[in-house]
Curated annotation (Swiss-Prot):
Subunit structure of this chain's protein: Part of the 50S ribosomal subunit.
One GO MF term attached to the UniProt entry: tRNA binding
Record keywords: Ribonucleoprotein, Ribosomal protein, RNA-binding, rRNA-binding, tRNA-binding
CDD domains for the chain: Ribosomal_L16_L10e
Single GO BP term: translation
Organism taxonomic ancestry: Bacteria, Pseudomonadati, Pseudomonadota, Alphaproteobacteria, Maricaulales
Assigned protein family: Belongs to the universal ribosomal protein uL16 family.
Record-given protein name: Large ribosomal subunit protein uL16
Length: 137
């Protein structure tokens, strides 16, 4: 699964996901992409599950680009532990996705296969998505 090699700080603030994506809203590599339509925190496991679903449907033909990276540590307190006594330990890694962000791109497969693969991948994500195609495709 994806996670940073090193980070400046072990734990991060929860924060809020405000506004639309400032960058990463155009297709850069592939012909088809999966675009987020709402703000959400996507975990490393969800990214990996989506990648697997897409590559399996494409039967390892073509190419997949993951345009998001889980760089935010999410901490969690153990079960049945009372409130207080500090922040919990980092449990998993997540990526804050803003609306308009292209999360996955694929190329090298026919349009119908690409759309089916991206629909299967979208089912693994907690975000409402839209399939986008490069103009002239």
């Amino acid at each position: 699964m994806l996670q940073p090699k090193r980070t400046k700080f072990r734990k991060a603030h929860k924060g809020r996901i405000k506004g639309a994506a400032k960058g990463g809203f155009t297709l850069n590599f592939g012909s088809y992409g999966l675009k987020a339509l709402q703000p959400e925190r996507v975990t490393a496991r969800q990214i990996e599950a989506t990648r697997r679903a897409i590559t399996r449907h494409m039967k390892r033909a073509g190419r997949v680009w993951i345009r998001i990276f889980p760089d935010v540590p999410v901490s969690k307190k153990p079960t049945e532990v009372r409130m207080g006594k500090g922040k919990g330990s980092p449990e998993f890694w997540a990526c804050k996705v803003k609306p308009g962000r292209i999360m996955f791109e694929i190329d090298g497969v026919p349009e119908n296969v690409a759309r089916e693969a991206l629909e299967l991948g979208a089912a693994k994500l907690p975000v409402k998505t839209k399939i986008v195609a490069r103009l002239g495709e």
